[in-house]
């Protein structure tokens, strides 16, 4: 992250997000809506948990996210029932050309726009450059750190969509 934080729960976030998205798309028959929205929302929720525990407990982000990764993998394994989650072929368009390129370009444009044209992006770079100065300038550093974890989690959710669509299946112990 641009703030100097480390997130070691990326793999677990992708696994959990992919399994939730796959279950929403297949079990609840929500199709692409369930796959995309479910995966991105789950990724953002995982990011919220990471950010909350990091900010409130004041434990280094490496330790918090490494520990939470084990919890996320356990939740994913429990949700999947220990079996492989398979995405039907009718929902795999985002894992093949040109769907995967379109999704990747959309996420790149969103990330670029957020980091270069919003107050959040400016504050992110300010906190990454010097957290002490940013705090003295009146930036609520803790709030923006949590938001950074949420945003990165949402992008990991988008990666989960690509992963499950390309591979067509996910096992909770893949990562």
Residue ranges and their predicted role:
Residues 1-28, 54:
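Single transmembrane alpha-helix segments in multi-pass membrane proteins
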Residues 6, 157-174:
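Non-cytoplasmic
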Residues 12-16, 32-41, 63, 101-106, ...:
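Hydrophobic alpha-helical transmembrane segments
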Residues 23, 28, 48-56, 79, ...:
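Membrane-interface helix caps of multi-pass small-molecule transporters
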Residues 29-69:
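Alpha-helical transmembrane segments within multi-pass membrane transporters and channels
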Residues 57-120, 144-147, 166-175:
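Transmembrane helix-bundle core of multi-pass membrane transporters
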Residues 141-156:
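Start (N-cap) of specific transmembrane helices in multi-pass transporter permeases
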């Amino acid at each position: 992250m641009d703030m100097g934080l480390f997130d070691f729960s990326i793999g677990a976030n992708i696994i959990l997000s992919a399994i939730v998205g796959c279950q929403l798309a297949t079990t609840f028959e929500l199709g692409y809506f369930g796959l995309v929205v479910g995966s991105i929302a789950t990724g953002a929720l995982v990011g919220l948990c990471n950010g909350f525990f990091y900010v409130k407990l004041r434990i280094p982000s490496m330790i918090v996210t490494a520990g939470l990764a084990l919890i996320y993998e356990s939740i994913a394994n429990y949700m999947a029932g220990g079996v492989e989650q398979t995405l039907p072929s009718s929902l795999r368009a985002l894992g093949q050309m040109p769907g995967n390129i379109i999704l990747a370009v959309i996420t790149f444009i969103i990330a670029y726009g957020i980091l270069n044209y919003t107050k959040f992006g400016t504050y992110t770079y300010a906190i990454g450059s010097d957290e002490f100065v940013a705090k003295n300038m009146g930036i609520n550093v803790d709030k923006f750190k949590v938001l950074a974890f949420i945003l990165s989690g949402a992008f990991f959710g988008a990666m989960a969509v690509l992963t499950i669509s390309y591979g067509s299946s996910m096992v909770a112990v893949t990562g």
